[in-house]
Amino acid sequence: MKRLQAFKFQLRPGGQQEREMRRFAGACRFVFNRALARQNENHEAGNKYIPYGKMASWLVEWKNATETQWLKDSPSQPLQQSLKGLERAYKNFFQKRAAFPRFKKRGQNDAFRYPQGVKLDQENSRIFLPKLGWMRYRNSRQVTGVVKNVTVSQSCGKWYISIQTESEVSTPVHPSASMVGLDAGVAKLATLSDGTVFEPVNSFQKNQKTPARLQRQLSRKVKFSNNWQKQKRKIQRLHSCIANIRRDYLHKVTTTVSKNHAMIVIEDLKVSNMSKSAAGTVSQPGRNVRAKSGLNRSILDQGWYEMRRQLEYKQLWRGGQVLAVPPAYTSQRCAYC
């Protein structure tokens, strides 16, 4: 079987390379937003969705236009991948797997992708990217498989590279033959049908006073000033640390469960519906809004969907299976009944 795997490392670019990467990310964001604006105009006119083939011709027009000739300075493939990302976003919307595509904002999820033309030199911990040249990265583990694509992204002022590879592996057979049910919760992150309990880490709840204090400090600074930018990076680093704590703990939990059980039965929870606001409208105000807001924070702090995602791919790699069942009446009996 073929296995797709991603390896993420922190980049160590030079000053000029970092400026070029910011420019490339901005160009990809511009292309995405402009294509989305055209799609919206086309939809308002009552026409059907325009596929990628037509959007690619728009990119050629924009490169030849006088006011957007600066797009030629960016590599073509990341710009094309930006349009393919928009097409993928529309397909997810049509299949009711995601919300309607939204415009991208500067500084949020700045990234661009290379589908080919990349050279990886693991011995010297460096990678070659078109129009950027050789760049060093923090080599923390060996990359295995054939490189399929590379994504460069920025987070908290640092640049990262995600290398997706494809490798041929033999069909795995899970060493265990047991089956277990997993009940996700807030007071207890996961309770297994054999009585095993995993306590929650509550990474945001334990640190929620600090983001609030930093956010108040940010509101008192001049927007887009140097001090405002520094304060914003502090907030971003804190939220990144909170997310890393949560993700690390979930990896430990899911690895333990996946190693010991061949089949894992979980609830098919709709987390987005469960964490909706109870505020209501002006004509029909909601009830117990403050209590529901606290419950929503606790639900999102657990990372139920991330736990399910990790279980699914780890079971696939180990030859196990994850079965999602309707959540109704799944928490009626304890493990000893």
Locations of regions flagged by a protein language model:
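Gly/serine-rich nucleotide phosphate-binding loop at the start of the catalytic core
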Residues: 1-79
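Long, hydrophobic, amphipathic alpha-helical segments used as structural scaffolds
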Residues: 36-43, 90, 94-101, 167, ...
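Acidic carboxylate diad motif detector
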Residues: 53-155, 280, 297, 301
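Positively charged, helix-rich recognition surfaces that bind polyanionic ligands
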Residues: 5, 19, 131, 139-146, ...
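Short glycine-rich, polar/acidic loop-and-turn segments at beta strand-coil junctions
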Residues: 15, 25-26, 36, 92, ...
